[in-house]
Amino acid sequence: FSSAKDPVNIAGFVAENILRNRIKMFNWEKAASLDNENILLDVRTPEEFRKGNIDGAINIPIDELRSRMNELPRNKTIYVYCQIGLRGYLASRILLQSGFDNVFNLSGGYRLWDACSKEKQETVVQSRTLIA
């Protein structure tokens, strides 16, 4: 037996999701282009949220999700994320099992979004420097 975040367990979650299509995923680029017609839900702790989050996200920690589900509109698409993906996966499953239809989980979580969006910003700055 190993921890929940062990790479073997994560690989198992990914494989099960692919085989059974349990959770729809979205990537970090999509997270940057969401509009007000969608809900971006951060299920990390308030402390993690304060340290950094995706613009426009609302924070409902996974431990509070069941008791605060009434704060989420059922007629909008909900894009869920956590730090690396596990809590987002679990939150997505909770929402789907509670009758929410359009739920997506961020592949790689906030950590990947943060790394990729910073890398993209640095590339744009470098490109502008080269052009000037």
Model-identified regions with their sequence ranges:
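Rhodanese-like catalytic fold shared by cysteine-dependent sulfurtransferases
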Residues: F1-I39, P46-Y79, Q83-A132
